[in-house]
Amino acid sequence: PFDDAGNIIFTRTWTDASEPKVDNQGNEIRPSQVEVYKWQSTFCKDDMGYIINPYQFYFEAGENTITMEGVNEPMVLKKLTLAAIDDSVTYEEYLANCPGEGNSETNINYVQVVQGEDSTIRSESSLYAKYDKSAPNTQPYSVTNTILNYVGGETWCSAGQWIEWEFSVPEDGYYNITVKGRQNYARGSVSSRTVYIDGEIPFEEMEEISFEYENDWNNLTLADADGNPYKIYLTEGTHTIRLEATLGGSGILLEELEDSIYRLNQIYRKLLVYTGATPDQYRDYNIDQVYPEVMEAM
C-alpha cells in the first residue's frame, strides 16, 4: 500500500544466560547473551523510527487479502490482528480513566529500586550490562573491582532499540517513576526514549522523554513541564517497563530531509544524463525548456 510497508522489522529478544560470575579477584564477569524464544505482539510500524505510532491501513468493507513476504531471517507467525485505531490520550484523559481512589500509606511510602544492569529482556545482544568506575553515585560501585552497574551507553543509540525491566508493587494505586541516566555522547543534543508500561504507552506524553547532555548521572523523574511527577496507575503484582530509543521530535524533520535528498538525487541523475559528467561551459542546455518539471521542483 505504501513504500514503508515493504520493510517491517520484527525484533528478536535477548537475555543473560546466567547470573554474573565473579573471578578470584572479585571482578564480575559479564554473562553471555542468549536468545529468548517467546511469542511477541507488535505493531507494524516505521523501522527507521521517524514515526512513533503504528502504521494505519485502509480496508474496504468485505473480504481483503494480506500477504507477507519473507525478506530476511526465519520467523514463526501465530496470528494477525486487525484493530480499530485508538487515539493516544493525554495525561489528563489518562487520569480521568483511572480509578479515583487515593493512595494508601503503603504505596505512598513504597520504593523499589531496579538496577539498570538487571534488565529482563532486550532487543539486541549488544545491550548487555557494563561497568562505570568513574562515578561514585552509581550502584553498586567499586574503585578497585569491575562491578556491572549500568546498561546501554553508546550501543543504545539507534531508533527502535529497547530494554525492558520487571518490577512489582504491593497494592493497587498511583506510583511515580524515576529514571537514573546519563547522556554524555551527543553534546548540544538530547537522547529520547519512549516509555512502555506493560507493553503499552500509557499516554502521549510518554511517547518521548528526553535526556539532555550531561557528564554526570542524574535522576529524571517522569513529570510534566511544571515538574509535577506523572502518576502511573498500577495494579498489585508484577509489571514491566520498557524504554525504547526514538528520534523524538526530530524524526519528522529527518524524514523530510531524507525525502528532499532523495528528490535532489533524482534531479541530479536526470541532468547528468542530459549534460554528461563534464558539462560544456560554452553551451546553453536550455534546461528550463527541456526539463521544465526539474526547474519547478528546484
Question: Residues of each region from the PLM?
Answer:
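Extracytoplasmic
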Residues: 1-298
